[in-house]
């Protein structure tokens, strides 16, 4: 049976700012963009969260919810440096580390001899080391599979941990709300509720064939999760699957010519980022993103073998014409999906 730990730093960016300036500790703060420039919140501390401030929320909305909120611009170079230090701490216990972002990672400690092989004690020691060396707190979840470890890490936040041992998995899952499963968002929660499914126990009683017919591939994934199945390994060589660039505008745009100028600028940035990963600019798909002044988001993409500016412009113009409906546009983004390395390798093999 595997022993998986999910380490999740507590309000990471904000925690670093509070560490470096103790006067911020007991007031609501957030790291994010300027409200005048249509900024977005990256993270908020717990005093701010009590007012309803959340990540990915517009800074303007956050300030409406919490007028006294102090919004800091963020120091990404420092956050990356701290993240590297955290990774060094994790690597003392296992080489099987899968970073998910700067502030969270999975560890497989199944074969670790540290702390007598106890995943619970390893997680405690990691969290203590992070605090001793960086004066930051982390939460942890311990379980036999990845998705349960991730769910568990959220249960005793902040600065806590939760263990789901193998003999408690079945009971834990039975009462688990479907909204707690990673990948089940608000739209899917409503769709499942319309099908009479609200907990994992409900899905366990559902015919898997019918579920797949109704939900496609995700139906099988959901059925597996509701039975405690997650075969995904902790992957230290996790590869980037996509690259994107986007810009939130200080003022809404209403003219296609304005959008064209922005896409020209974004394309140069996307091309530069992609060339660092794929010098030949080969991709699997490319697409565009538009967010309107009512915050509705639309994304369009299609299969394309190479990064292609003209194709992106055509796709964007088609989306602009068919989806905008007179609304202003507050965000424009471009993205590419990279080729699966295994598929790419197979395509290069000789017959």
From Swiss-Prot:
Coiled coil location: none
EC code: 2.7.7.7
Signal peptide positions on this chain: none
Keyword DNA repair: yes
Record: active site: 104
Gene Ontology cellular-component annotations: cytosol
Domain UmuC: 4-185
Record keywords, A-Z: Cytoplasm, DNA damage, DNA repair, DNA replication, DNA-binding, DNA-directed DNA polymerase, Magnesium, Metal-binding, Mutator protein, Nucleotidyltransferase, Transferase
Top EC class of this enzyme: transferase
UniProt-recorded Gene Ontology molecular function terms: damaged DNA binding; DNA-directed DNA polymerase activity; magnesium ion binding
Cofactor annotation comment: Binds 2 magnesium ions per subunit.
UniProt keyword Nucleotide-binding, yes or no: no
Binding of Mg(2+), residues: 8, 103
Substrates-to-products reaction catalysed: DNA(n) + a 2'-deoxyribonucleoside 5'-triphosphate = DNA(n+1) + diphosphate
Cofactor: Mg(2+)
PROSITE patterns named in the record: UMUC
Major subcellular location class: cytoplasm
Similarity annotation: Belongs to the DNA polymerase type-Y family.
Subunit relationships: Monomer.
PANTHER family for the chain: DNA POLYMERASE KAPPA, DNA REPAIR POLYMERASE UMUC / TRANSFERASE FAMILY MEMBER
Functional summary from the UniProt entry: Poorly processive, error-prone DNA polymerase involved in untargeted mutagenesis. Copies undamaged DNA at stalled replication forks, which arise in vivo from mismatched or misaligned primer ends. These misaligned primers can be extended by PolIV. Exhibits no 3'-5' exonuclease (proofreading) activity. May be involved in translesional synthesis, in conjunction with the beta clamp from PolIII.
Entry protein name: DNA polymerase IV
Organism: Photorhabdus laumondii subsp. laumondii (strain DSM 15139 / CIP 105565 / TT01)
């Amino acid at each position: 049976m595997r022993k998986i730990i999910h380490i999740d730093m507590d309000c990471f960016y904000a925690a670093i700012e509070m560490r470096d300036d103790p006067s911020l500790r007991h007031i609501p703060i957030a790291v994010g963009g300027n409200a005048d420039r249509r900024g977005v919140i990256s993270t908020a501390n717990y005093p701010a969260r009590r007012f309803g401030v959340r990540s990915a929320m517009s800074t303007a909305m956050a300030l409406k919810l919490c007028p006294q909120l102090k919004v800091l611009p963020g120091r990404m170079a420092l956050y990356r440096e701290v993240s590297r230090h955290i990774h060094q701490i994790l690597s003392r216990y296992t080489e099987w580390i899968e970073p998910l972002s700067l502030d969270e990672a999975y560890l497989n400690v199944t074969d670790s001899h540290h702390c007598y092989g106890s995943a619970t004690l390893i997680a405690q020691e990691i969290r203590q080391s992070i605090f001793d060396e960086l004066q930051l707190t982390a939460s942890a979840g311990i379980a036999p599979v990845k998705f349960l470890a991730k769910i568990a890490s959220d249960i005793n936040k902040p600065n806590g941990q939760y263990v789901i041992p193998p003999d408690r998995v079945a009971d834990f899952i039975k009462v688990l709300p479907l909204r707690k499963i990673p990948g089940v968002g608000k739209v899917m929660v409503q769709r499942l509720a319309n099908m009479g499914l609200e907990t994992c126990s409900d899905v366990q009683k559902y015919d898997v064939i019918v579920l797949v017919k109704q939900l496609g591939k995700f139906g099988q994934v959901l059925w597996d999760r509701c039975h405690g199945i997650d075969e995904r390994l902790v992957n230290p060589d996790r590869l980037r699957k996509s690259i994107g660039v986007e810009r939130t505008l200080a003022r809404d745009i209403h003219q296609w010519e304005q959008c064209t100028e922005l896409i020209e600028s974004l394309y140069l940035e996307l091309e530069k980022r992609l060339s660092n990963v794929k010098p030949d600019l080969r991709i699997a798909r490319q697409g565009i993103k538009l967010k309107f002044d009512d915050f509705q988001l639309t994304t369009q993409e299609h299969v394309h073998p190479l990064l292609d500016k003209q194709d992106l412009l055509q796709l964007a113009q088609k989306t602009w014409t068919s989806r905008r409906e007179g609304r202003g546009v507050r965000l424009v983004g471009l993205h590419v999906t990279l080729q699966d390395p295994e598929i790419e390798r197979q395509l290069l093999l000789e017959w």
